[in-house]
């Protein structure tokens, strides 16, 4: 078996409008599909970031009362989403101007590249990495 690539990552959010604003209007994801699922009385939002072979889709499912995410101590499962950027410092400046707090920039001990973390509206850790 040979897997070609990651096709998409799916996340559950507690506030659909807040998540849509964050991922589309602040982080710049493109909307691929937006569907109201009548049988579940909720929305599903498919987003894309990147081009060609570097593109990845993010599926957002709205759940009005999901259990809280366990961040500390870390639990099994998805730890964080990481995004490659050309310039971590410039990207952090843009995020801060939009009111998004970022952790201090540091060097990844393995790649020796600059990196930092910030969080989505539900507390999902997001990483920027050069």
Q: What is the predicted role of each segment?
A:
Residues 1-2, 46, 92-130:
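Vicinal oxygen chelate
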Residues 58-60, 128:
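Generic preference for hydrophobic
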Residues 71-77, 81-89:
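Mid-chain, well-packed structural core segment of small domains
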Residues 12-55, 97:
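Core segments of cupin and vicinal oxygen chelate
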Residues 32-33, 42-43, 65-71, 104:
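A short, acidic/glycine-rich surface segment
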Residues 1-18, 78-83:
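N-terminal beta-strand motif that seeds the catalytic metal site of vicinal oxygen chelate
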